[in-house]
Amino acid sequence: MGTGWRRAFCTTAPRNSDAAAPDLDKQRTGYNLTPSPSPRSCVKLAFLSGGSNPSTPRSTSSPSLRCRTADAQTPTAEQTSTPRSATKSPRLSLAAISNPSSPRSPLKLSLFRNSFKFRSTCGICLNSVKTGQGTAKYTAECSHAFHFPCIADYVRKQGKLVCPVCNSIWKDASLLVPHKNATESPLDDSVSVIQEKRVVVTSSPRAKPRPKQSDYSRFYDDDEPLLSPRFVTIPEADENCGGEEEDDVPQFKGFVVDPNPSFAVKTNEIPVNGRDFGNVQVSLLPEAAVVSVGCGYETRAVALRVKAPPPLTARGGVGRRLLDPSQRAPVDLVVVVDVGGTMNGAKLQMVKRAMRLVISSLGSADRLSIVAVVMTVPKRLLPLKRMTEHGKRSAGAVVDGLLCGQGSNTSEALKKASRVLEDRRERNPVASIVLLTDGQGQLSKVHTNQRSTITNVGSTRFAHIEIPVTEHGFGESGGCSNAPAEEAFAKCIGGLLSVVVQDLRIQIRVGSGSGPCEISAIYLCNGRPTLVSSGSGSVRLGDLYAGEERELLVELRVPSTATRAYQILSVRGLFKDPSTQEVVYGRDQSLRVPQAVRSSSSPRIERLRSLFIATRAVAESRRLVEYGECTSAYHLLTSARALLGQSGTVEAAEYIKVVEAELVEVQWRGQQLMEYQSQHQQQHNQRRRGSERETTTTMTLMDENGEPLTPASAWRAAEKLAKLAMMKKSDLHGFENARF
């Protein structure tokens, strides 16, 4: 009677009795080595242990599940010998909180209690994170709370943004990113930003491994942000409220827009930095060529030259002064360095010196990226980074680490450079790509005094922005490190960086007081021959560097009765100021077309005629190829080649090669188009045969009522036929031997 209440509880023992036998002595002395919770913890979680008595010792000597009874009021020595630190240890895992062997252990409830515990306590130091204790609190995306110094120290040591409690990946942890990147070197941080993101994803043991991204699916949007914009203070209402501001307000002239607005520039619109951005020179060459004579009219060709103004520092004659960042707009520059098999020894050293010159010439507002042509896969060694002191040190370390490799793929490197500029998040007013190579395997050199349609300057356009691609070759004499070569390279880089005209547009029309004539077409000679306008209209030339020239070929159609009259062309344009991004309107200029002579042996006129024939043929053939008319394009180029061959001059022979090269390309495109059409026709025929076969099969599987033929419908049809046969037989019963 005095023993008090007794409680029955269930315990589990391991299956291996031999391994559990040596542990009996330790259990008797008060040390519990089983994964079951301690007696003090079972008191707190009695509802999870099935009502067990915390004062009863547990035995694991038996390999079976059995019940025991113990006195609830008599404390044993084994209970008192349990360490207090072990009973109040806050580091209780999920296995220690809930007994998985008990049939009454609610796993969901234990998970909820576990998650609720880590919301009110720090997941690292396991102390309370309640407010008012003088320590900042950080709550992660997974709802786990931490002390900010604890989680910052954890991220700094581990180098990854993963929850230490549930191992979930944190996507939005902007406060912890500086602590994650604190121990990384500046060069590694600037070179492998995208690789670090992959490491974070794959470092979590619960994260699924992602397939490696290909080079073409990678986005280069890790460019360094631009300088913070300057805030311009807005004056109050009582400041500068003179009567002069009211005079500058234009009067309302009605809702009818003037079709011919004035493009004159006011004196206060011209920048005050010493450069006259409105001084874009537009002139006609002093010769005009008669291309063809038709019934009642003749076709003439004139060349229009557009030249950008030179920079102010060019007057001093010092090439390095062209690189002054204060005299130009900020630029995003991508340098493609060829470090193939031919760029070894002295050439590689000269490339490094040129790169150091480029780095030193850029300012803090400029950004630089480096792409190396290595083997067949180009590599981006440096993202778009502002050329501050830290950025210049990072770029210099990349340049010093350049080594000569084997093979080169310049076209893929230029594609990657274009991707770098396409994927950038922020944009400077000017963007440029520079290719540094020895020139071997690239475009062949052209003669200096030749008006060739293929030059060393091309352009890659995207999103209405022109990215000029410039190739600077070192040639066989690349090892000669003399001062004039570096001075010439400094002038070249200075000209590339000094964009003085941006998004230039020119409108050409017949001026007032001109003789009867008509503008048939306008062709662009520089780069790829292109039809930029059919008739009078606006011509977009894009960005112009300091002192850069562009040539346009204007096709005029003059009546035969007005061949002796003077024709006048009116030219006006507009562009953006690269430094201020303001639109500058140019003044109207009237240009007098020179008189053309039908029969002339002048080399300049013959060269102009040959240039016009080749440019027009190439431009029109490309336009026809875009519409899929390769045969017409081939006949057009063949006629142009025959027409150039009739003159027999040296100038015509040079342009015949250009037309023949275009003929080869048109033939190749025609073959590709024929193969595509044949494959498309075969696929169409296969689809049509398949549809006919399906239609035939469907028709054969239909009954007389148009319903699909199934076993049930076939059985019903057979029953119907059997009934009809029986009815006919019954109707003829008794008339077998009858004669009618």
UniProtKB/Swiss-Prot annotation:
<feature type="compositionally biased region" description="Low complexity">
    <location>
        <begin position="49"/>
        <end position="67"/>
    </location>
</feature>
<dbReference type="Pfam" id="PF25243">
    <property type="entry name" value="WAV3_C"/>
</dbReference>
<dbReference type="InterPro" id="IPR013083">
    <property type="entry name" value="Znf_RING/FYVE/PHD"/>
</dbReference>
<keyword id="KW-0863">Zinc-finger</keyword>
<dbReference type="InterPro" id="IPR051266">
    <property type="entry name" value="CLCR"/>
</dbReference>
<comment type="subunit">
    <text>Interacts with SINAT1, SINAT2, SINAT3, SINAT4, SINAT5, TOR1/SPR2 and FIP2.</text>
</comment>
<protein>
    <recommendedName>
        <fullName>E3 ubiquitin-protein ligase WAV3</fullName>
        <ecNumber>2.3.2.27</ecNumber>
    </recommendedName>
</protein>
<keyword id="KW-0479">Metal-binding</keyword>
<dbReference type="GO" id="GO:0008270">
    <property type="term" value="F:zinc ion binding"/>
</dbReference>
<keyword id="KW-0808">Transferase</keyword>
<feature type="domain" description="VWFA">
    <location>
        <begin position="332"/>
        <end position="476"/>
    </location>
</feature>
<dbReference type="InterPro" id="IPR001841">
    <property type="entry name" value="Znf_RING"/>
</dbReference>
<dbReference type="InterPro" id="IPR002035">
    <property type="entry name" value="VWF_A"/>
</dbReference>
<dbReference type="GO" id="GO:0010274">
    <property type="term" value="P:hydrotropism"/>
</dbReference>
<dbReference type="Pfam" id="PF13519">
    <property type="entry name" value="VWA_2"/>
</dbReference>
<keyword id="KW-0833">Ubl conjugation pathway</keyword>
<dbReference type="GO" id="GO:0009630">
    <property type="term" value="P:gravitropism"/>
</dbReference>
<dbReference type="GO" id="GO:0048364">
    <property type="term" value="P:root development"/>
</dbReference>
<keyword id="KW-0862">Zinc</keyword>
<feature type="region of interest" description="Disordered">
    <location>
        <begin position="677"/>
        <end position="709"/>
    </location>
</feature>
<dbReference type="GO" id="GO:0016567">
    <property type="term" value="P:protein ubiquitination"/>
</dbReference>
<dbReference type="InterPro" id="IPR036465">
    <property type="entry name" value="vWFA_dom_sf"/>
</dbReference>
<feature type="region of interest" description="Disordered">
    <location>
        <begin position="14"/>
        <end position="105"/>
    </location>
</feature>
<dbReference type="GO" id="GO:0061630">
    <property type="term" value="F:ubiquitin protein ligase activity"/>
</dbReference>
<comment type="function">
    <text>E3 ubiquitin-protein ligase involved in the regulation of root growth. Acts as a positive regulator of root gravitropism. Possesses E3 protein ligase activity in vitro.</text>
</comment>
<dbReference type="Pfam" id="PF13639">
    <property type="entry name" value="zf-RING_2"/>
</dbReference>
<feature type="zinc finger region" description="RING-type; atypical">
    <location>
        <begin position="122"/>
        <end position="167"/>
    </location>
</feature>
<feature type="compositionally biased region" description="Polar residues">
    <location>
        <begin position="71"/>
        <end position="90"/>
    </location>
</feature>
